[in-house]
């Protein structure tokens, strides 16, 4: 669940019992929740962030159970960016920038069950940085969390 910036709405992500992706938008209206939009996606959505999107646009970046990084237009529920970020499930995502030229380019960081950490610029198809476990490691550790921090314009 992520609050939509500067609104009384939030996105709810997840996976249904039929293993389809859940992407719902709810709005608070006089203390009650109203379902505004409901979309079913091909695969479960693990998590998302608005941090790499300007407030005026409010695109949400997500990682799913098949390792895809997808940026959605929340007003229409359509994909604006779609790339295979990880070989297995994406576990976490964070973002920074994209708020204007003084705050830098939009960037996303993802961590996955394949043990990789990748930094993405959504204006490009490939990651700008990819940290991967050694090829000769018998067991690849999961990457459970990622975050941008201490980065001020």
Please report, for each region that a protein language model flagged, where it lies by residue.
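WD40 beta-propeller repeat fold
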Residues: 1-153
């Amino acid at each position: 669940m992520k609050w939509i910036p500067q609104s009384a709405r939030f996105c709810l992500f997840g996976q249904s019992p039929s293993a389809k992706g859940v992407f719902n938008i709810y709005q608070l209206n006089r203390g009650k929740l109203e379902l505004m939009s409901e979309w079913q996606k091909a695969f479960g959505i693990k998590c998302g962030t608005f941090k790499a999107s300007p407030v005026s646009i409010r695109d949400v970046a997500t990682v799913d159970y098949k390792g895809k990084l997808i940026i959605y237009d929340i007003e229409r529920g359509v994909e604006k960016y779609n790339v295979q970020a990880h070989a297995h499930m994406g576990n976490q995502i964070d973002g920074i920038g994209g708020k204007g030229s003084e705050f830098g380019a939009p960037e996303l960081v993802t961590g996955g069950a394949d043990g990789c950490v990748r930094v993405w610029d959504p204006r490009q198809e490939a990651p700008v940085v990819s940290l991967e476990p050694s090829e000769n490691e018998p067991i690849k550790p999961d990457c459970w969390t990622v975050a941008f921090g201490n980065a001020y314009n």
